[in-house]
Amino acid sequence: MTSHGAVKIAIFAVIALHSIFECLSKPQILQRTDHSTDSDWDPQMCPETCNPSKNISCSSECLCVTLGGGDETGTCFNMSGVDWLGHAQASDGHNDG
């Protein structure tokens, strides 16, 4: 092996070890423990729009969702079928899990 090849391998090893160290030193994101599928959660669109930068909000049963930041119009979604802990509720309002 030439010295040029050895230098390439050494640089790669240093970068790989540095990457591993950086990944292990950062706090890990907690993963959901329930195994619900996306079909359990079906938000419904509300017939209105919103714009937080202009203080235009959704009605009380809907939540404003914008994609991006700045002066952007968002879409209102009804989230009444979700208990906000990650479990979908049955149509009668009782938790099915």
UniProtKB/Swiss-Prot annotation:
Predominant cellular place of this UniProt entry's protein: secreted
The keyword Secreted belongs to this UniProt entry's keyword annotation: yes
Entry keyword set: Disulfide bond, Glycoprotein, Secreted, Signal
A GO cellular-component term linked to this record: extracellular region
Signal peptide span: 1-25
Entry keyword Disulfide bond: yes
Disulfide bonds: C46-C62, C50-C64, C58-C76
Subcellular location, record wording: Secreted
GO molecular function, one term: C-X-C chemokine binding
Functional note: Salivary chemokine-binding protein which binds to host chemokines CXCL1, CXCL2, CXCL3, CXCL4, CXCL5, CXCL6, CXCL7, CXCL10 and CXCL11.
Protein name per Swiss-Prot or TrEMBL: Evasin P1142
Biological source species: Amblyomma cajennense
